[in-house]
Amino acid sequence: MITCLIVDDELFAREELADSLSQEADIEIIGQCSNAIEALQTITKEKPQLVFLDIQMPRISGMELIAMLDPDTLPKIVFVTAFDEFAVKAFDNHAFDYLLKPIDADRLSKTLKRVRKDLTPQAVNLIAPRSLEHLPCYSGSKLKVIPIQDVEYVFSDLSGIHVACTKGKVHTQLTLKVLEEKTPLVHCHRQYLISPKAIAEIELLDTGAEVTTLLGDKVPVSRRYLKSLKQLFGFQ
């Protein structure tokens, strides 16, 4: 059984695809998501083998969602799009699976045959954005899209990944690895990433240092990262 997730902001498109997939005996639809934040949470929690992903979604596009996923746990992606010459060309150049809206039954059947033969995730990072402009976050039952320039630092603990921004603290499903690779945030501690632009002061301590951010928060700096952090500002 192949577990799959459908991600599309259009309800009719999701239901139409789900109806077609429900006729396949070896496909189990584990969920449907209407936006990238819901999709990131579901992919992280449920770990579907296959994701049908609409690339033209508001605020955070399907391509941006790809950039947010950890390459080590990436599912097989089938892109879904209204005709977009440049996107289709990119998909063809890299031999990625894609479906054009409205989805043709024969095309879907051929795509599923290829997927059944090979569930190995593609190197979709080749066409994903190199950096993130927004972070998908949540606060209680509210989903939030935080501009990366509003983020002062992020940190991890047993309850997850926390984002400290100009409007308070929220949570994200993004990993520290993805955040370090796709944003201007840099390591200052094993459990912390910080925006250099948010640093107001660095106080040197016997055990490392402590940063005071522009909003007045205190962030630890371990000895391991102190030198590289100082060098960002021209200190030796």
Curated annotation (Swiss-Prot):
Residues 135-235 form the HTH LytTR-type domain. Gene3D superfamilies: 3.40.50.2300, LytTr DNA-binding domain (2.40.50.1020). Pfam families: LytTR, Response_reg. Keywords: DNA-binding, Phosphoprotein, Transcription, Transcription regulation, Two-component regulatory system. PROSITE patterns: HTH_LYTTR (PS50930), RESPONSE_REGULATORY (PS50110). The keyword Ribosomal protein does not apply. One of its GO terms (molecular function) is transcription cis-regulatory region binding. The modification 4-aspartylphosphate is found at residue 54. It comes from the Bacteria. InterPro entries: CheY-like_superfamily, LytTR_DNA-bd_dom, Sig_transdc_resp-reg_receiver, WalR-like. GO terms for cellular component: cytosol; protein-DNA complex. Residues 3-116 form the Response regulatory domain. The keyword Acyltransferase does not apply. GO terms for biological process: regulation of DNA-templated transcription. This is Uncharacterized response regulatory protein SO_2823. It comes from Shewanella oneidensis (strain ATCC 700550 / JCM 31522 / CIP 106686 / LMG 19005 / NCIMB 14063 / MR-1).
